[in-house]
């Protein structure tokens, strides 16, 4: 399973660790992913999404039905 938010599309990015001597070593910055179950009243079922904390805030703002419609419009299967 890839480390990608299903709502925002955020994925890992690459950067550098920097020591005190400013030596650079490669590292990955991972998104703050959580697996969360949402009750969808219109479909009378639970939907499990893998999303970031920001994605949860978007669902709080727009509602689960609107967000699911956007995800399905992109062609993702839920």
Swiss-Prot record:
Disulfide linkage: none
User: Alphabetically, which GO biological process terms does the record hold?
Assistant: translation
Q: Which residues form a coiled coil?
A: none
Q: Which UniProt keywords apply?
A: Ribonucleoprotein, Ribosomal protein
Q: Name one Pfam family in it.
A: Ribosomal_L28
Q: Which GO terms describe its molecular function?
A: structural constituent of ribosome
State a GO cellular component annotated for this protein: cytosolic large ribosomal subunit
Entries under Gene3D superfamilies matching the protein: Ribosomal protein L28/L24
Name the protein family. Answer: Belongs to the bacterial ribosomal protein bL28 family.
What protein name is recorded for this chain? Large ribosomal subunit protein bL28
Annotated organism of origin = Glaesserella parasuis serovar 5 (strain SH0165) (Haemophilus parasuis)
UniProt lists the gene as rpmB
């Amino acid at each position: 399973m890839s480390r990608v938010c299903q709502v925002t599309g955020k994925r890992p990015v690459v950067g550098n660790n920097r020591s005190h001597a400013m030596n650079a070593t490669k590292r990955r910055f991972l998104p703050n992913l959580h697996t969360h179950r949402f009750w969808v009243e219109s479909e009378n079922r639970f939907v499990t999404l893998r999303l970031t904390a920001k994605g949860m805030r978007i669902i709080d703002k727009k509602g689960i039905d609107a967000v699911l419609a956007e995800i399905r419009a992109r062609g993702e299967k839920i």
